[in-house]
Curated annotation (Swiss-Prot):
Subunit and interaction comment: PSII is composed of 1 copy each of membrane proteins PsbA, PsbB, PsbC, PsbD, PsbE, PsbF, PsbH, PsbI, PsbJ, PsbK, PsbL, PsbM, PsbT, PsbY, PsbZ, Psb30/Ycf12, at least 3 peripheral proteins of the oxygen-evolving complex and a large number of cofactors. It forms dimeric complexes.
Listed GO biological process terms: photosynthesis
Protein name: Photosystem II reaction center protein L
SUPFAM superfamilies: Photosystem II reaction center protein L, PsbL
Assigned protein family: Belongs to the PsbL family.
Residues that span the membrane, as ranges: 17-37
Localisation: Plastid, Chloroplast thylakoid membrane
Gene Ontology cellular-component annotations: chloroplast thylakoid membrane; photosystem II reaction center
Length: 38
């Protein structure tokens, strides 16, 4: 687990999942607000 290669891959995976999580939260917030204000 202390290898630099697997470390780099883990960091990239975490960053990608973080971006997807933020995108999902953003989409849910837009849908939620449009549902409320309708």
């Amino acid at each position: 687990m202390a290898q630099t290669n697997s470390n780099k891959k883990t960091v990239e995976l975490n960053r990608t999942s973080l971006y997807w999580g933020l995108l999902l939260i953003f989409v849910l917030a837009v849908l939620f607000s449009s549902y409320i204000f309708n």
